[in-house]
């Protein structure tokens, strides 16, 4: 069971205790700090929709430290990032791999960041499957459609050609923060909150 820190705020007459994620939400900060699955996806989607309703003109700040995970859960987060009218600024701390990298690069243009020692990894979608030959064929066709859509997203957010994206995602491709910036996955490497 993960340990969740709490913070206490007082305004003179009363004290309030928040779990750290609820407190960060007050400052429009959301956090993807685990593998992408339906549970974290639903939580992030709900937080973005709440922040959109609260103030549709203020940025949302999404911090990412994720090894990737479920494509469908990740696409729910991606679609919501594109759906809300607020800009979603993305920050890679630690790692953004696979679906985590897709979400990192899906941030608002000019507002995609990584800390200096962050690692970013892109690759083609992965899947394991079993069943009859026909069932496997159906899954392979779906995996090809997913790969095509992932490539379209990377093209849209990086400006690279389909050929380059296909070549670069054929196998795991790891990048430093500086390399990810040169590649177009992020806009800037930041060393402090003042950058």
Curated annotation (Swiss-Prot):
- Give the UniProt family note: Belongs to the peptidase S14 family.
Q: What class of enzyme is it?
A: hydrolase
Record-listed E.C. numbers: 3.4.21.92
What this protein is called in its record is ATP-dependent Clp protease proteolytic subunit 2
Quaternary structure and interacting proteins, as annotated:
Fourteen ClpP subunits assemble into 2 heptameric rings which stack back to back to give a disk-like structure with a central cavity, resembling the structure of eukaryotic proteasomes.
Q: Which HAMAP family did the record assign?
A: ClpP
UniProt xrefs under Gene3D superfamilies: 2-enoyl-CoA Hydratase, Chain A, domain 1
> Which residues are responsible for catalysis?
98 (nucleophile), 123
State one Pfam family annotation: CLP_protease
GO terms assigned for molecular function:
ATP-dependent peptidase activity; ATPase binding; serine-type endopeptidase activity
One GO-annotated biological process of the protein:
protein quality control for misfolded or incompletely synthesized proteins
User: Any idea what job this protein has?
Assistant: Cleaves peptides in various proteins in a process that requires ATP hydrolysis. Has a chymotrypsin-like activity. Plays a major role in the degradation of misfolded proteins.
Q: Which reaction does it catalyse?
A: Hydrolysis of proteins to small peptides in the presence of ATP and magnesium. alpha-casein is the usual test substrate. In the absence of ATP, only oligopeptides shorter than five residues are hydrolyzed (such as succinyl-Leu-Tyr-|-NHMec, and Leu-Tyr-Leu-|-Tyr-Trp, in which cleavage of the -Tyr-|-Leu- and -Tyr-|-Trp bonds also occurs)
InterPro entries cross-referenced by the UniProt entry = ClpP, ClpP/crotonase-like_dom_sf, ClpP/TepA, ClpP_His_AS, ClpP_Ser_AS
Tell me which UniProt keywords the record has, alphabetically. Cytoplasm, Hydrolase, Protease, Serine protease
